[in-house]
């Protein structure tokens, strides 16, 4: 026979079975959710969630984030913004209206002048154009449209 009884056997006949008479082994003894992170659950939070509590650094109240945000695209990549079919259709029919390439709609604000354009007119819409880009677009008979 074992010399020690298990706790459950010892507690037979005792009404509350070791769980007290008020709480009666119910509800949320440690609090709900993240309760006690700075107090009775501190060890767990420090070990598994370091840096969860507290502040770091100073706050800038009127910070304007990235005012110089200006994605760019070069002339040699400009025709990738419209489909190849569109380019071929307008290359055949040079008398009709020139295709419009909206760089801002594609997420680019400024058009830069690297590369060459095919010899067909095109209307380019953007917020900014470099001097060379504007010259090259106009040299193939196109136009630059500034948009806000």
Swiss-Prot record:
InterPro entries: Rbsml_uL15_N, Ribosomal_uL15, Ribosomal_uL15/eL18, Ribosomal_uL15/eL18_sf, Ribosomal_uL15_CS. Residues 1-30 have a biased composition (Basic residues). Residues 1-38 are annotated as: Disordered. One of its GO terms (molecular function) is structural constituent of ribosome. It is found in: Cytoplasm. The keyword Ribonucleoprotein applies. Pfam families: Ribosomal_L27A. Gene3D superfamilies: 3.100.10.10, 4.10.990.10. It comes from the Eukaryota. Keywords: Cytoplasm, Ribonucleoprotein, Ribosomal protein. GO terms for biological process: translation. The keyword Disulfide bond does not apply. One of its GO terms (cellular component) is cytosolic large ribosomal subunit. Component of the large ribosomal subunit. Belongs to the universal ribosomal protein uL15 family. Component of the large ribosomal subunit. The ribosome is a large ribonucleoprotein complex responsible for the synthesis of proteins in the cell. This is Large ribosomal subunit protein uL15. It comes from Xenopus laevis (African clawed frog).
